[in-house]
């Protein structure tokens, strides 16, 4: 891939256009209304469609960290348009496209930051980054060419995407790298009522000449109380290179929020009203079917046994096995994962999810990437309908499974489409043109 200016200057302009499509056993999608039936999968979230996932444009200058003589600086501005804006959106920054309109397509300035290289701080120097940047941990990445596959793991879909603040990365020596920073929280801008002063600390230990790396990260250090995506999250990621063509990555996280509203509390109208203590969503109502709370107790329990709020945790583990072949012009991608959304706060349904994916990357020159894949998702819901069927946790609009839970478990509402559906099979592919 060549930048627009032919890489002749330290300031680069480049980008890509990514178009994707899929065929899925989940068939309740209405893309024009933002109903994404492939959830909890991402980014191929709209089933049985062809879509513009990303049209991305980069403006950047990369600081020179190969020298120790002098200060240097860099910057990046990334402009993104497409369906994938719904994953990168930060509350308070053009977020009405998603949180009010639930639009299929949207625009997001996903990165805008300044880097300052400090060569004398640490044996390997330090970089201070200020602005909006990609959240530090994770195997996967939001921007299409930076990811192994077209789709993303469920683990990645429901954790932190971006932060706005400052981070210092220091290479202590050839083995240890330390990162620390401060922000208003995950996917939240500082001028919103959801903003919380939030710290983060990550440590990476690398050994055997880079063949092994262990990253430990506390990504959100604050009070952990309910707010927009205010996830207290602990990460452990391990990378191992077997040889020149095979490697594996494994990631585990445990997340939680405290004092999360109970979707089934009898006085939900007052609890869910937008206020300083419950600032999200931007649009709200008095019903119990809002999709931002948790299933704190069994929905079939009487009102007297339902708590107003609860502790809502979840854990997940994902593994990738990667093999490069054809002189690094193609790769085999294998992903396996388990996610336990204990209180349903992330996906909308208290359930254990397993997902398995096999895919390929094929490069045609330096301009075209083609990534086909086949994935299977199975969920094990923790509740059943009055006639004993499992509550739906696939083929339902992202986050709205709570509404289906109420209708099915309590038996007092219209039967939702997709009732009892607990698995999905998806054949998907994307094509990326780099410029």
Describe each region flagged by the PLM.
Residues 41-44, 88, 98-102, 210, ...:
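Outer-membrane beta-barrel pore domains
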Residues 184-187, 222, 255:
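A short, flexible beta-alpha/helix-coil linker loop
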Residues 4-25, 29-188, 193-200, 204-208, ...:
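Outer membrane beta-barrel
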């Amino acid at each position: 891939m060549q930048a627009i200016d032919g890489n002749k200057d330290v300031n680069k302009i480049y980008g890509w256009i990514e178009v994707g499509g899929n065929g899925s056993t989940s068939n309740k999608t209405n893309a024009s209304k933002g109903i994404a039936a492939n959830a909890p999968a991402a980014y191929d979230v709209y089933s049985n469609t062809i879509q513009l996932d990303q049209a991305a444009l980069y403006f950047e200058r990369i600081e020179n960290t190969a020298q120790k003589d002098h200060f240097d600086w860099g910057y990046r501005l990334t402009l993104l348009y497409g369906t994938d804006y719904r994953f990168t959106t930060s509350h308070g920054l053009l977020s009405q496209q998603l949180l009010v309109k639930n639009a299929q397509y949207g625009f997001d300035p996903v990165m805008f930051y300044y880097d300052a290289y400090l060569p004398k701080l640490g044996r390997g120097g330090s970089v201070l980054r200020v602005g909006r940047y990609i959240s530090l941990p994770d195997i996967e990445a939001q921007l299409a060419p930076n990811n192994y596959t077209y789709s993303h793991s469920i683990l990645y879909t429901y954790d932190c995407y971006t932060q706005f603040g400052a981070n210092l990365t220091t290479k202590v020596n050839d083995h240890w790298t330390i990162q620390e920073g401060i922000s208003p929280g995950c996917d939240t801008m500082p001028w919103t009522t959801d903003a919380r002063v939030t710290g983060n600390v990550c440590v990476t230990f690398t050994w055997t000449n880079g063949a092994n790396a262990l990253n430990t990260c506390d990504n959100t250090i604050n009070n952990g109380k309910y707010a927009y995506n205010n996830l207290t999250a602990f990460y452990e990621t391990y990378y191992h290179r077997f040889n020149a063509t095979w490697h594996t990555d494994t990631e585990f996280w445990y997340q939680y929020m405290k004092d999360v509203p109970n979707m089934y509390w009898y006085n939900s109208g007052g609890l869910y009203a937008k206020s300083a203590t419950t600032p999200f969503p931007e649009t709200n109502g008095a019903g119990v079917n809002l999709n931002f709370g948790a299933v704190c107790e069994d929905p079939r329990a009487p009102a007297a046994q339902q708590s107003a709020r609860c502790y809502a945790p979840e854990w997940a583990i994902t593994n990738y096995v990667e093999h490069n072949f054809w002189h690094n012009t193609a790769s085999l991608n294998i992903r396996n994962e388990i996610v336990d959304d204990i209180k349903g706060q992330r996906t909308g349904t208290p359930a254990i999810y397993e997902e398995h994916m096999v895919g390929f990357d094929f490069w045609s020159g330096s301009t075209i990437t083609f990534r086909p894949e086949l994935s299977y998702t199975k969920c094990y819901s923790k509740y059943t309908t009055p006639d004993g069927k499992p509550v739906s946790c696939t083929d339902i609009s992202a986050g709205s499974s709570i509404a289906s839970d109420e209708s099915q478990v309590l038996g007092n509402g219209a039967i939702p489409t997709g009732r009892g559906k607990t698995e999905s099979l998806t054949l998907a592919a994307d094509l990326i043109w780099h410029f």
